[in-house]
């Protein structure tokens, strides 16, 4: 039996402003820092410790992870970073307010862009300043493969191979793993682990900074999964995430 912990980053500045973020490298809010600290304290109270952590190359996930590790007195822990764990790229929606976008295009259309499996938002056009090709953290990513937009299927296509080739061998070696990432990169991984259908994945919402535990059998198939926080806390946090893409009444 193996056990891993998944953790979405704490509230970011654009979460607070209800903006589509994607690959934009925004920081944590004061609340987000507190959420990350609370997550670390919860993991400590529940007796969790880790041998290796994985995260994206975006600061909101990195800072969340560092705060958690500080609470666990484990800042020495080896950490592997990969753009493959980045948030889904939201294309031309990046930076736009979700409620304002819903008011313009309709709640249903924005729900499709946010939560559908295979329909991407409008793509960034060549020359858009949001296409940060020259960012050194993406030095290994060929320009031709740099995303201008992504649907969840595209995110799955980069997350799952990373899981299988990089993370799985570490789990099988007996190392205790923490993955600190993003709402949609975690949705991609959970879809794969739980075998969630393309249609049902629309309803999956990942709350910020709430440790999610997966217990896996010898074949790394989920035996059970659960949040460490109580059900009412998780239900309210998931509802808040679900409501972000709706027009204000």
UniProtKB/Swiss-Prot annotation:
Positions bound to substrate: 8-15, 21-22, 60, 87-90, 98, 114-115, 183-184
SUPFAM superfamilies: Phosphoglycerate mutase-like
Any GO BP: gluconeogenesis
Reaction catalysed by this enzyme: (2R)-2-phosphoglycerate = (2R)-3-phosphoglycerate
Catalytic activity, EC: 5.4.2.11
Pathway per the UniProt entry: Carbohydrate degradation; glycolysis; pyruvate from D-glyceraldehyde 3-phosphate: step 3/5
Domain of life, per lineage: Bacteria
Record-linked Gene3D superfamilies: Phosphoglycerate mutase-like (3.40.50.1240)
Active site (catalytic residues): 9 (tele-phosphohistidine intermediate), 87 (proton donor/acceptor)
A family per Pfam: His_Phos_1
InterPro entries linked to this entry: His_Pase_superF_clade-1, His_PPase_superfam, PG/BPGM_mutase_AS, Phosphogly_mut1
UniProt site (Transition state stabilizer): 182
GO MF annotations in UniProt: phosphoglycerate mutase activity
Segment forming the signal sequence: none
Protein role: Catalyzes the interconversion of 2-phosphoglycerate and 3-phosphoglycerate.
Self-association and partners: Homodimer.
Family classification: Belongs to the phosphoglycerate mutase family. BPG-dependent PGAM subfamily.
Descriptive protein name: 2,3-bisphosphoglycerate-dependent phosphoglycerate mutase
Organism the protein comes from: Azoarcus sp. (strain BH72)
Gene name of this polypeptide: gpmA
């Amino acid at each position: 039996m193996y056990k891993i912990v998944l953790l979405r980053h704490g509230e970011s500045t654009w979460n607070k402003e209800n903006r589509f973020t994607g690959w934009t490298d925004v920081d944590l809010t004061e609340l987000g820092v507190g959420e990350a600290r609370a997550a670390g304290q919860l993991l400590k109270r529940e007796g969790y410790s880790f041998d290796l952590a994985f995260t994206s190359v975006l600061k909101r996930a990195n800072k969340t992870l560092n705060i958690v590790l500080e609470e666990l007195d484990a800042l020495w822990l080896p950490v592997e970073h990969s753009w493959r764990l980045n948030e889904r790229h939201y294309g031309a929606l990046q930076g736009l307010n979700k409620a304002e976008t819903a008011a313009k295009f309709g709640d249903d259309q924005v729900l499709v862009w946010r939560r559908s499996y295979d329909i991407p938002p409008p793509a960034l056009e060549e020359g858009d300043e949001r296409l940060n090709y020259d960012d050194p953290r993406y030095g290994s990513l060929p320009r031709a493969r740099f995303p201008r937009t992504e649907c969840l299927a595209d995110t799955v296509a980069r997350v799952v191979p990373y899981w299988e080739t990089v993370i799985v061998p570490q789990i099988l070696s007996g190392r205790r793993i923490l993955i600190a990432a993003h709402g949609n990169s975690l949705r991609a991984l959970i879809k794969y682990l739980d075998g969630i259908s393309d249609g049902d994945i629309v309803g999956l919402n990942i709350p910020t900074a709430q440790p999610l535990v997966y217990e896996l059998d010898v074949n790394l198939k989920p035996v059970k999964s659960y949040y460490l926080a109580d059900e009412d806390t998780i239900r309210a946090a998931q509802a808040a995430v679900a409501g972000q893409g709706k027009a204000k009444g």
